[in-house]
Amino acid sequence: SEPGRREGKRSYSMEHFRWGKPVGKKRRPVKVYPNGAEDESAEAFPLEFKRELAGERPEPALGPEGAAEGMAALADLEYGLVAKAEVAEKKDDGPYKMEHFRWGSPGKDKRYGGFMTSEKSQTPLVTLFKNAIIKNAHKKGQ
């Protein structure tokens, strides 16, 4: 009776999806630490001392698992430094570029909320107002 109860629970918990169960796993964000390497000395030493320690580390004495972790920590440290340099370069490029639209900036008619409005729908309203004004003027004239 245990698997049946689990299936019942699953179908209940998936009812908030529109077409049944979700496809694939939920993506979890990758944790990015600002200080780069993840070891015990991360809090104790500033960035310059960590670089010196990484250079003086005797890799053959660590063993196969320790060497792999040491290389991964070095790669993470380098990746963090390269990413920071790229961000600094991008900030100095100049004016803001609209890169979040697929083919550059949107058209002038679409810029300020123009996605939802259409100009054709306003013409009947204008004619209605014109007719009301004309009728009102005729009534006052008589």
Swiss-Prot record:
ACTH and MSH are produced by the pituitary gland. GO terms for molecular function: G protein-coupled receptor binding; hormone activity. Its main location: secreted. One of its GO terms (cellular component) is extracellular space. Keywords: Amidation, Cleavage on pair of basic residues, Endorphin, Hormone, Phosphoprotein, Secreted. The modification Phosphoserine is found at S41. It holds the Pfam family ACTH_domain. Specific enzymatic cleavages at paired basic residues yield the different active peptides. Transmembrane segments: none annotated. One of its GO terms (biological process) is regulation of corticosterone secretion. It is found in: Secreted. The modification Valine amide is found at V23. Belongs to the POMC family. This is Pro-opiomelanocortin. It comes from Neovison vison (American mink).
